[in-house]
UniProtKB/Swiss-Prot annotation:
Gene Ontology CC, one term: cytosol
Keyword Hydrolase: no
GN (gene name): rsmG
Protein name: Ribosomal RNA small subunit methyltransferase G
SUPFAM superfamilies: S-adenosyl-L-methionine-dependent methyltransferases
Subcellular location: Cytoplasm
UniProt keyword annotations, A-Z: Cytoplasm, Methyltransferase, rRNA processing, S-adenosyl-L-methionine, Transferase
Length: 211
């Protein structure tokens, strides 16, 4: 079995466990994204995960676990790294618009190449520090995964949404200490415990809004 076939098998089994349906084209885009990440990773050190099969679990399936919970049409993924979770979510939601923000040029170059190679029309990679970035219009969702504490995320990103916008943070263990540190200007509107196929460890989603 080729690595491409192995990745496809892991993906299909993961999608089934997550009760998600993606087209053959979307599945192929996700496999190709992992293969591209693995290729670039050897030279540019985009992620500490070295095994492409582990990338499929720890990066792709972990990102796709958000799919049932993602609302809004105009989404920014801050501190996205090589495009996580924004790139897999953009593949899953071709009708939504995604801005993928990172301050490191090598990551943004990789994302730009990925967008071109995968034929994605709904992704805009941007190189910038989050506090220096301003969208043309307020975003519906500010999304983060392994980016910063909730307090820092809200401080740096509050200008990216209006009163209706939401902040959505993907965390490991339930971040009780971080929640207690959140400014009085924001409130936690919802939390969700996620199960990611083949991934050991806790995963939680935290929604926050301006008061």
């Amino acid at each position: 079995m080729t690595i491409q076939q192995e990745l496809h098998t892991i993906l299909v089994q993961g999608l089934d466990a997550l009760s998600l349906e993606l087209s053959e084209r979307q599945q192929q885009q996700l496999v190709d994204y992992v293969l591209l990440m693995d290729k670039w990773n050897k030279a540019y050190n985009l992620t500490s995960v070295r095994d492409p099969k582990q990338m499929m679990v720890k990066h792709i399936l972990d990102s796709l676990a958000i799919v049932p919970h993602l609302e809004g049409d105009n989404i920014i993924d801050v501190g996205t790294g090589p495009g996580l979770p924004g790139m897999p979510l953009a593949i899953a939601f071709p009708e939504k618009r995604f801005t993928l923000l990172d301050s490191l040029g090598k990551r943004v170059r990789f994302m730009t190449q990925s967008v071109h190679t995968l034929g994605l029309k709904n992704v805009t990679p941007v190189q910038s520090r989050v506090e220096a970035h301003n969208g043309e219009v307020p975003y519906d969702i500010v999304l983060s995964r392994a980016f910063a504490s909730l307090k820092d995320m809200l401080h740096w990103c509050q200008h990216l949404v209006d009163s209706e916008g939401q902040f959505l943070a993907l965390k490991g263990q339930f971040p009780q200490d971080e929640i207690e540190e959140v400014s009085d200007h924001f409130h936690v509107s919802k939390t969700e415990n996620l199960t990611v196929p083949n991934l050991v460890g806790e995963r939680h989603l935290v929604w926050l809004k301006k008061k």
